[in-house]
Amino acid sequence: RELARDLIGQELGRYNEEQLLAARAPLDLPAEDALAEAVHDALFRLGRLQPLLDDEQLENIDVNGPDEVWLEYADGTVVAGPPIADSNEELVELIRSIGAYAGHAARRFDAGYPMLDLKLPDGHRLAAIMEVSTRPAMSIRRHRFQRVFLAHPHEDNLLDMGVVDYGLAEFLAACVRARKNIVISGETGAGKTTMLRALANAMHPAERLITIENALELGLHEHKDLHRNVIALEARQANVEGEGEIAMATLVQRTLRHNPYRVIVGEVLGDEVVSMLEAMSQGNAGSLCTIHSSSPAFTFRRMAMYAAKSAMRLEPWVTYQMIEGAIDFVVFIHQHIDRGADGARRRVRHVASVLEVLEADGRIVATNEVFQPGPDGRAVPYTPPRCLGDLELEGYDPSLFHNPNGWWAP
């Protein structure tokens, strides 16, 4: 690519010489640099989409057609963005080339398979759709924190971000060390994947991990100083003959043959919930997953809904019994847009509740609310968990539960 930049520079130099010979103004330095970068992006990166991906403050990019782009920043501000293509056909071709070259394996994007999900080279998540929409559309979730911790003096961490306080960070780290199975739930964009990364980074670097995702985005295998022994698995869609599909449920079942110390499911989206619960209850203690949910309690109903739609058609009471034997804690993350005294918008994310799973009957999953929402909605200590002794063995200080207001910064 350095050679390409040199060649682009040479061509622009020749262009400027021709302009001077023709008594026309050459490109000034800023214009020349901008054109060189645009040509490089078009040839080797993602064209007009690339400058948006390079913006560290952007969190979501929604494309409703080639000329309708919406940008959502980390503080929740939404503004219109520049066009990224000149026509529907050009946008489809851009997405198709991304599917062919940018992911872990080539993925189709055509009339026969008009939906695409994949991880971009820089770790961001892309979802695209065509044919069933009036115009081709695309959404990109930028993962601003690829390497993140619960608490860390020198790296990105949830404590500094205000997602957890000191007491929560200590509690969750102890849960990970004690190999408790944890489900992270919350609405879209709440920061579930970021929390999952932070919890995973509290594990010992030598532990063997297997991650399963619909589209690779966790990236734990890319940080060898944090995770030395990782297999990253990605679901695969069928080929043009309709063959070769490998579903997430199949991959979760397969993990049991590969000696995992922990199994991590990036996002539970369907019938893989049954395989995941089986894996968690069959010796893979300390496993993690995320799931969409509007409340802590609805997390269990969401799992029951997925299991009911699976090939096994499980009754809710059966799923609840599986949850009792598989899940130790549910960490629920809440998000909202806050307006400061100056009127500026700010997206706020924080843990609102931590549930400990106790038992289940035919109707409900009984839980113990270990951390409950305080007056401002942020989680504060409420009821010590039944497994407190296990956490103490891993270095947790039980006196941290004696502060009913938590350690949140004002």
Regions found by a protein language model. Name each.
Residues 341-410:
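NTP-binding/hydrolysis catalytic cores, primarily Walker-type P-loop NTPases
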Residues 186:
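The Walker A (P-loop) glycine that initiates the GxxxxGKT/S ATP-binding motif of P-loop NTPases
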Residues 192:
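Conserved lysine of the Walker
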Residues 189:
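Walker A (P-loop) phosphate-binding loop of P-loop NTPases
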Residues 61, 128, 263, 284, ...:
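Residue-level signature of catalytic and energy-coupling elements of molecular machines
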Residues 1-109, 117:
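N-terminal accessory targeting/assembly segments
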Residues 72-178:
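P-loop NTP-binding catalytic core
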Residues 179-182, 198-324, 334:
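Switch/coupling sub-region of P-loop NTPases
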